[in-house]
Amino acid sequence: MDWLKNTTIVVLFSHSTDKSNKHKKRQVQCNMRKNTLDMVTIGIACLVGVYTGTRFFEPIVIDRLRKDGNLRTDIPIPEYDEDGNLLKVTPSLSSTPAAPPTPPTPPTPPQQ
């Protein structure tokens, strides 16, 4: 008779979890939506942060490269005023594109 009581308890317990499983499914779906929204929000915030960070540090980096003598001269470099505002992009004479290299001529086959 003891095994019957235990079986009944198990059946009643498993029956009561069916209702809670539906609730848990809804809760998991809600958590997944919340997690997805959080990840998208963090991604957008990171993109905005990187964009504004590069816009902020670009004049500082260009100035430092110019002082060190490591600034490339083959590309146009934007000019900034003392406040870091973009003045004008002026292409320098050395930034004119060079002629593309000519392809090597194929070797002539030996005549027989």
From Swiss-Prot:
Residue span of region Disordered: 82-112
* Cellular localisation: Mitochondrion membrane
Q: What else is known?
A: Present with 1890 molecules/cell in log phase SD medium.
What is the predominant subcellular site recorded for this chain? mitochondrion
Q: How does it sit in the membrane?
A: Single-pass membrane protein
Q: Which organism is this protein's natural source?
A: Saccharomyces cerevisiae (strain ATCC 204508 / S288c)
Name of the protein: Protein ECM19
UniProt feature, compositional bias: Pro residues: 98-112
Q: What does this protein do?
A: May be involved in cell wall organization and biogenesis.
Q: Which UniProt keywords apply?
A: Cell wall biogenesis/degradation, Membrane, Mitochondrion, Transmembrane, Transmembrane helix
Q: Name one GO cellular component term.
A: mitochondrial membrane
List all membrane-crossing ranges.
35-57
Q: What is any one GO biological process for this UniProt entry?
A: cell wall organization
